């Protein structure tokens, strides 16, 4: 399994994003709104940097002792009658879940929003085995109907407008009302209600698993998690192995950071906590509970210079300030995980072969690092990825290597440099208009296809300096 969402080339995805005016406007508007909310909530707290430091320390401590806390978590879950399965790979996770679904003879599975289940391709695996899978998060449900991957970690359907959503509902579910948000939401609620009531198995992700109690917490705004965790007889939680905290107090800190950093709220509408199978004295919840803990490449990141990437609490604060994401959108990253955190995490989970461009999808402005509520040094990790790509993986294009080698030889030869600056203006004259090079030749074409390149000056700095020095000397002698 792969975190990739398609086979279209990186350049084609970027071009498609840049040409999508609605998407760019929607992303820009959302980024501004989320950023304003985050800054407002940080100011209201008054000691935001102290909270960030505490969040970073909690994540660092947890990962440095992850074996202990995973063991504690599994003990607590099993103590309450749950089943725990450690999946080394996506295939192992999917196979285990498929077997549970088949054993229950389940025809319908209902899910909450979950990045890790998208990462391992769980929906596709279950559908191949004959089960109907229904996403219950509104954004994810829209995308599922339209067979479209998410473009944002928190707001997966950010790239769609309400007219497109209405068309999807009409084509796939016979919707015949207007595109007003209220009517669209009411229709989705009516449709999903039937799925909740008829589902045989409920599958959730996990925001934070609490090691000391075995509790699983879900942070949502729609209330769908309550339905998924209380109605089906069989419940399966799928979590990345890093998604745990030692105590309830640690969870409180990270949830406070998560909600403020993600959407600028003190709290989301719902924070759900559940602890496995239903006990005799309880009136709702599943009879059978399974916790699937997924590695899928994460253990290889532990103990490396990229370990802090696993601190991520999936708030998307880095995405909400990224200028590259603003212009190209989430699909350009060709990964379930877009934005700066995706550019760091995707090559670690899936290798450089298909994702060697991602570390370069950054201006290195460090806005992502500044926004991250758990202080992941994202821009530094992007630079390190670039070093590895060039020095170890040897993934740089041959043309780029030849070009850079030629540039080095040219720039280190004063005579060649001086001559080229003299002839450059004349050589580029056929492509120059109003002091800018348009539709330039050779290596300049990639640049000038999307923006104008300043034409060489009428006089080089070197010549100007020489004339200035001569003038001062003459004035001094007069």
Curated annotation (Swiss-Prot):
Pfam families: Fer4_8, LUD_dom, LutB_C. It comes from the Bacteria. GO terms for molecular function: 4 iron, 4 sulfur cluster binding; metal ion binding. The keyword Iron applies. [4Fe-4S] cluster 2 binds at residues 322, 365, 368. Residues 303-333, 352-381 form the 4Fe-4S ferredoxin-type domain. InterPro entries: 4Fe4S_Fe-S-bd (IPR017896), 4Fe4S_Fe_S_CS (IPR017900), FTHF_cligase-like_sf (IPR024185), Helical_ferredxn (IPR009051), LUD_dom (IPR003741), LutB (IPR022825), LutB/LldF (IPR004452), LutB_C (IPR024569). SUPFAM superfamilies: alpha-helical ferredoxin, NagB/RpiA/CoA transferase-like. [4Fe-4S] cluster 1 binds at residues 312, 315, 318, 372. One of its GO terms (biological process) is lactate metabolic process. Keywords: 4Fe-4S, Electron transport, Iron, Iron-sulfur, Metal-binding, Repeat, Transport. Is involved in L-lactate degradation and allows cells to grow with lactate as the sole carbon source. Has probably a role as an electron transporter during oxidation of L-lactate. Belongs to the LutB/YkgF family. This is Lactate utilization protein B. It comes from Oceanobacillus iheyensis (strain DSM 14371 / CIP 107618 / JCM 11309 / KCTC 3954 / HTE831). The lineage of its organism: Bacteria, Bacillati, Bacillota, Bacilli, Bacillales. The gene is lutB.
